[in-house]
């Protein structure tokens, strides 16, 4: 697969704007399309044009944006059960130096506001009532740790790996945060990350 950072770098070097926000996101094109990954005001759907994907029957299927169901926040429905193998994107021509400058500005903004330790990005979808990070902070859970998984002291909607964290460390921490949010604020937190394995139906 192709990392988003590589795609952003290629676009910048070739004077193609619209991909600046991708730099620094720890993901690959295929998974990012499924999740409609986004940051800094951009997302995958905004630059997506077409794709070839493997469906549940093992057949290759072509997808063109204008014939697909509209994307939602953190989901492109047509890729929920289809594995993207190849994708084409559309950008806007621009000056490579200006594009690189915006890319670097986004990178610095991300470094200043998001933890640099390994993580899966934002853990929870923002509920209507309050941003998830603010809620978790108000619950006093910044820095709360289970095993080697920790609620980031920098941004409470990130669960970071302090070193060799187990999947159970992360899922137990998610469980604890959700239970506290429900008990103390009456808010049900929905995970933004996709949990795969024995407990995936619970998230």
Where do the protein language model's features map onto the residues?
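A glycine- and small-aliphatic-rich helix-loop capping segment at beta-alpha/alpha-beta transitions
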Residues: 10-16, 35-46
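Gly/Ser/Thr-rich helix-start
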Residues: 2, 25-32, 39, 122, ...
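Anion-binding (especially nucleotide phosphate/pyrophosphate-binding) glycine-rich loop
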Residues: 1-29
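Short polybasic amphipathic segments
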Residues: 49-53
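Phosphate/pyrophosphate- and phosphate-bearing ligand-binding catalytic cores of soluble enzymes
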Residues: 54-175, 179-203
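Core subunits and conserved enzymes of cellular information-processing
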Residues: 7, 23, 30-41, 82
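N-terminal short leaders/motifs
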Residues: 2-9, 37-38, 73-79
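Short glycine- and Lys/Arg-enriched binding-loop motifs that mark or flank ligand-binding interfaces
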Residues: 20-27, 34-37, 117, 143, ...
């Amino acid at each position: 697969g192709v990392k988003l950072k590589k795609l952003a770098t290629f676009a910048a070097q070739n004077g193609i704007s619209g991909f600046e926000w991708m730099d620094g996101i720890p993901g690959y094109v295929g998974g990012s399309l499924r999740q409609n990954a986004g940051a800094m005001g951009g997302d995958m759907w905004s630059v997506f044009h077409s794709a070839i994907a493997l469906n549940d029957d093992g057949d290759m299927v072509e997808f063109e944006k204008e014939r697909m169901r509209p994307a939602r926040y953190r989901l492109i429905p047509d890729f929920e059960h289809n594995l993207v193998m190849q994708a084409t994107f559309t950008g806007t021509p621009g000056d490579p130096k200006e594009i690189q400058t915006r890319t670097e500005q986004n990178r610095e903004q991300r470094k200043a506001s998001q933890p640099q330790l390994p993580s899966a990005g934002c853990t929870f979808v923002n509920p209507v009532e309050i941003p998830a990070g603010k809620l978790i902070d108000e619950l006093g859970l910044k820095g709360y740790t289970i095993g080697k998984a920790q609620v980031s002291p920098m941004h409470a909607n990130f669960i970071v790996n302090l070193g060799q964290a187990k999947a159970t460390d992360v899922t137990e921490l998610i469980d604890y945060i959700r239970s506290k949010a429900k008990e103390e604020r009456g808010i049900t937190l929905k995970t933004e990350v996709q949990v795969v394995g024995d407990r995936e139906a619970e998230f």
